[in-house]
Amino acid sequence: MAKCYVTGKTTSFGNKRSHALNASRRTWKANLQTVRIKDENGNVKRVKISAKALKKLELERV
């Protein structure tokens, strides 16, 4: 399953409701972006990060 490297955000599940309040299952997927970052040792690592975390954090991208 796709998961954010920073926040741990994954797919959420719930119901879609019609006007008659019938319930059918649906999913909300996180806006994950694949980026390359440097870790503590200076090695380049490819990870998936949510767009919200990408805006908030100051990561050293490659």
UniProtKB/Swiss-Prot annotation:
Pfam family, one: Ribosomal_L28
Keyword Lipoprotein: no
Listed PANTHER family: 50S RIBOSOMAL PROTEIN L28 (PTHR39080), LARGE RIBOSOMAL SUBUNIT PROTEIN BL28A (PTHR39080:SF1)
Ribonucleoprotein recorded as keyword: yes
Similarity remark: Belongs to the bacterial ribosomal protein bL28 family.
Source organism of the structure: Acholeplasma laidlawii (strain PG-8A)
Protein name in UniProt: Large ribosomal subunit protein bL28
A GO BP annotation: translation
A single cellular component GO annotation: ribonucleoprotein complex
Keywords tagged on the record: Ribonucleoprotein, Ribosomal protein
A molecular-function term among this protein's GO annotations: structural constituent of ribosome
